[in-house]
Amino acid sequence: MKIVAIARDKCFSPHSVENDYAILQAVVEGLQQPIVWVAEEQVRIAGLPPADLYLTMARSAAVLQQLAEAEKAGKRVVNAAESVAQCVRSVLHRVLQAHAIPLPPTEGNAGYWLKRGDASAQEQGDVVFCRDKEALAMQQQLFVQRGVTDWVVEAHLPGDLLKFYGVAGGFFQYFYPSDDGISKFGDEQRNGLAHHYAFDATQLQTMVEQVAALTGVEVYGGDVIVAPSGEFFLIDFNDWPSFSRCRETAAKAIVAWVKHNYLNETK
């Protein structure tokens, strides 16, 4: 079986280039198969190398289109092109609303988050905290000046910020960013140090796996806010994150999933 691994373009890996590369490398090494490496930009320019299975972290529309065509031709892709497209924020937001996934409200008294809706965050200005409605309107004008007219607005929710990581087949882990200080843009500081409010972790995993099923994503991660009451609200969901907090165990889970479902191996 011919396998190609597609490394994510730098523009889709803000402050995470090395970590994104590291998780894909760990999976490639774990599979112990001859695998061709290719950069997302190279695929965009020169096209997909021939393969039976693509392990891809690509997010650009041009590459996703090529992967979708490969799938139509019977090739296998992890994560599938359509599933990655479903993770575009505004698309995902509509899907989650339609299926009653707990999301932050659009109104609140603790500020707002303005989030670019037509793509995943590529720079700090794509997700902006606004202290009130006036600041929100100003930031929306700045978005328009940048050519961004598709966005999502969510009320800021006080509570514990929690990051989760998952792989189809049952792997699920979560962490509190304030416990280890790891941050991409520093936005986590808005929620301060975690209080470690009690919540139902099994219920959280069930909800996250429902989101994964709705999108079709097999390798995923995201963020929730856990309120003092124990309720949680999904604020982000991404295809194939860096798994920087649990890379080794996550890579093993991805390898096991790929072997069992795509290489017809169970060892």
Say what each PLM segment does.
Residues L103, W113, T149-V153, V219-G222:
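A short linear hydrophobic-aromatic micro-motif
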Residues Y112, F172, Y220, F233-D236:
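Protein kinase-like catalytic core scaffold
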